């Protein structure tokens, strides 16, 4: 999880034509809804799919999709992309997560021993998905970036864990109990962060409903814009590449990003890493997979920089200059 600032490297100083596209802040309320992200605080009870369906119904859109499923009994951060924004949910598909769990041990445990055992689970661990899992039950490795004891009260413990996507917190608690020799089960779980998105930023379903009602009833979209983030926020954690106006439409048509289309970019990033394409006005075009690392991009004058995987911007938002100039289907 890279949530800190990156260095921006400018390859070419270029202005953007104000006649094409628009900064996200200048979108109409309807456009804002169509290209938005909701950082929802999912309550315990409903499934993630049910919650996403409620958001879709409240906002009157055809599609809404969530990233990182939470079981019905689990609460916390659930990113939901709305309408066109669902096209770039890939940006969050492999994001790391932070959970706070309440564990109950089946016997008395010493705090010092518990802390020592938790330390053994930091790093690469092996996990087999639970019996009720939707995925094939094959043994696999997952990274536990950190795990700490927040509180111990009798046989109950509050444990905070920062883990790789796809890690089963319930199984982790079970395995900790096995190593301690007393057994354990998870009594409660809350997700407090997804990548750079924390529970302090979340909103409730009631917030979404109220914001939409106020806009429809009174024409005031101030609250709506606070509750629904612009879809650009879905790429907050990704390295960004800003492209020249002449390259935008090619990317919208699924073309790979070539070096001449790059105006500036954030470093560092590695070959194979997911990157986000932006216009010079700050609009999210889509996401792709880097074909070279950022150090190579600094020196490149030709060749491919990234493969385009998902596109959110509508074709024709910027004119197809790449066709007029006979550059072929490369941005």
Curated annotation (Swiss-Prot):
The keyword tRNA processing applies. Could be responsible for synthesis of pseudouridine from uracil-55 in the psi GC loop of transfer RNAs. One of its GO terms (molecular function) is RNA binding. CDD domains: PseudoU_synth_hDyskerin, PUA_Cbf5. Its EC number is 5.4.99.25. It is an enzyme of class 5 (isomerase). This is Probable tRNA pseudouridine synthase B. HAMAP family: TruB_arch. It catalyses: uridine(55) in tRNA = pseudouridine(55) in tRNA. Belongs to the pseudouridine synthase TruB family. Type 2 subfamily. GO terms for biological process: box H/ACA sno(s)RNA 3'-end processing; mRNA pseudouridine synthesis; rRNA pseudouridine synthesis; snRNA pseudouridine synthesis; tRNA pseudouridine synthesis. Residues 238-313 form the PUA domain. The gene is truB. It comes from the Archaea. The active site is at residue 71. PROSITE patterns: PUA. Keywords: Isomerase, tRNA processing. It comes from Pyrobaculum neutrophilum (strain DSM 2338 / JCM 9278 / NBRC 100436 / V24Sta) (Thermoproteus neutrophilus).
């Amino acid at each position: 999880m890279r949530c800190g600032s990156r260095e921006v490297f400018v390859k070419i100083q270029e202005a953007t034509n104000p006649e094409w596209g628009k900064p996200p802040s200048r979108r109409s309320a309807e456009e804002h809804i169509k290209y938005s992200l909701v950082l929802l605080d999912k309550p315990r009870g409903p499934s993630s799919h049910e919650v996403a369906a409620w958001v879709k119904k409240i906002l009157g859109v055809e599609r809404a999709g969530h990233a990182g499923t939470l079981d019905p009994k689990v609460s916390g951060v659930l990113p939901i992309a709305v309408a066109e924004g669902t096209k770039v949910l890939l940006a969050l598909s492999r994001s790391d997560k932070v959970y706070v769990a309440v564990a109950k041990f089946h016997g008395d445990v010493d705090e010092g021993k518990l802390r020592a055992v938790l330390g053994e689970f930091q790093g690469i661990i092996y996990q087999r998905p639970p019996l009720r899992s939707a995925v094939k039950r094959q043994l696999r490795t997952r990274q536990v970036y950190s795990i700490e004891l927040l509180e111990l009260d009798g046989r109950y413990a509050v444990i905070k864990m920062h883990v790789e996507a796809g890690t089963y917190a319930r199984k982790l608690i079970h395995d900790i109990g096995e190593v301690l020799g007393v057994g354990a089960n998870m009594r409660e779980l809350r997700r407090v962060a997804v990548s750079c998105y924390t529970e302090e930023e979340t909103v409730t379903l009631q917030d979404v409903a109220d914001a939409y009602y106020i806009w429809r009833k009174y024409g005031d979209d101030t609250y709506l814009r606070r509750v629904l983030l612009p879809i650009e926020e879905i790429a907050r954690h990704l390295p960004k590449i800003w492209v020249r106006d002449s390259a935008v439409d090619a990317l919208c048509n699924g073309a790979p990003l070539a070096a001449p289309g790059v105006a500036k970019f954030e470093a560092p990033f590695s070959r194979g890493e997911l990157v986000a394409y932006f216009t010079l006005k700050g609009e999210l075009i889509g996401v792709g997979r880097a074909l070279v690392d950022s150090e190579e991009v600094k020196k490149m004058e030709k060749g491919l920089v990234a493969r385009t995987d998902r596109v959110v911007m509508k074709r024709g938002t910027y004119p197809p200059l790449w066709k007029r100039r006979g550059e072929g289907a490369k941005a």
